[in-house]
């Protein structure tokens, strides 16, 4: 089984930057994307955009050469989650995610659903603790562990299920790299270049701090999408990380 995305249209990037596209207007989203270079970043499509515009928005981005992280955080019974992950793979996305709190059987089913895709399978990662959550939020859910402790427990479960990595805060990255190994990928939202507004993220870091902490892929949204010159902003971020992207 192979994905529908054409590998010939994809442009390989060495950048760890994933730009979060949070648009409710398709034309505005594509107008922004046409300002940037797929050598400088990958793109993340979340629930709002995918619900509004459907799979075609992913194809539109792929046709422009971009790898796409489909950030839908699947969390359902194992069979349903497995079919959803397989559908994402069939769409040709570069990365897809599930909620680790869905449990071991769900995550294992999701991983097994990607076996038929072979080398074309997307990276499969799990969400541990949302970066907007604090200890008081977890306590409301009956979780007495700190966000860091709960995230590490879920990350270990994710690795035991054979997934490729986790979404975690940058503050957890150093410990996770040490505990879970270099090959276990860490994807981190809440990344803000120096001087950017924190927005609704509670646990944030600069790109340079995130790279030093062991983050493999850093999700950056408004500091790029709301920049007066997003292409220049991306070049500057990549340069600060020692990445020459073209």
From Swiss-Prot:
PROSITE patterns: OMPDECASE
Keyword annotations from UniProtKB, A to Z: Decarboxylase, Lyase, Pyrimidine biosynthesis
Lineage: superkingdom: Bacteria
CDD domains per record: OMP_decarboxylase_like
Pfam families listed in its UniProt record: OMPdecase
Molecular function per GO: orotidine-5'-phosphate decarboxylase activity
List of catalytic residues: 73 (proton donor)
Catalyses which reaction(s): orotidine 5'-phosphate + H(+) = UMP + CO2
EC number: 4.1.1.23
Primary enzyme class: lyase
UniProt pathway annotation: Pyrimidine metabolism; UMP biosynthesis via de novo pathway; UMP from orotate: step 2/2
GO CC terms in record: cytosol
One GO BP annotation of this record: 'de novo' UMP biosynthetic process
Entry binding sites for substrate: 22, 44, 71-80, 131, 192, 201, 221-222
InterPro entries: Aldolase_TIM (IPR013785), OMPdecase (IPR014732), OMPdecase_AS (IPR018089), OMPdecase_bac (IPR047596), OMPdeCOase_dom (IPR001754), RibuloseP-bd_barrel (IPR011060)
HAMAP family xref list: OMPdecase_type1_B (MF_01200_B)
Record-stated family: Belongs to the OMP decarboxylase family. Type 1 subfamily.
Assembly: Homodimer.
Job description of the protein: Catalyzes the decarboxylation of orotidine 5'-monophosphate (OMP) to uridine 5'-monophosphate (UMP).
Listed name of the protein: Orotidine 5'-phosphate decarboxylase
The organism of origin for this protein: Enterobacter sp. (strain 638)
Lineage: Bacteria, Pseudomonadati, Pseudomonadota, Gammaproteobacteria, Enterobacterales
Gene: pyrF
């Amino acid at each position: 089984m192979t994905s529908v995305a054409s590998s010939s249209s994809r442009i390989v990037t060495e950048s760890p930057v994933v730009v979060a596209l949070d648009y409710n207007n398709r034309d505005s989203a594509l107008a922004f994307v046409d300002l940037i270079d797929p050598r400088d970043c990958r793109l993340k499509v979340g629930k709002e955009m995918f619900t509004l515009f459907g799979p075609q928005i992913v194809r539109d981005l792929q046709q422009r050469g971009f790898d796409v992280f489909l950030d839908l955080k699947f969390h359902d019974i194992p069979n349903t989650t497995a079919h959803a992950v397989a559908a994402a793979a069939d769409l040709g996305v570069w990365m897809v995610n599930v909620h680790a709190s869905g449990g071991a059987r769900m995550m294992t089913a999701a991983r097994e659903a990607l076996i038929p895709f072979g080398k074309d399978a997307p990276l499969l990662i799990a969400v541990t603790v949302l970066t907007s959550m604090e200890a008081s939020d977890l306590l409301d859910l009956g979780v007495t562990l700190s966000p860091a402790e709960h995230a590490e427990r879920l990350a270990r479960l994710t690795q035991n299920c054979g997934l490729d990595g986790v979404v975690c805060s940058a503050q957890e990255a150093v410990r996770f790299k040490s505990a879970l190994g270099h090959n276990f990928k860490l994807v981190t939202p809440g990344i803000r270049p120096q001087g950017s507004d924190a927005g609704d993220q509670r646990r944030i870091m600069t790109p340079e701090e995130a790279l030093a902490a062991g983050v493999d892929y850093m999700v950056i949204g408004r500091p790029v999408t709301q920049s007066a010159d997003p292409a220049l902003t991306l070049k500057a971020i990549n340069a600060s990380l020692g990445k020459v992207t073209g």
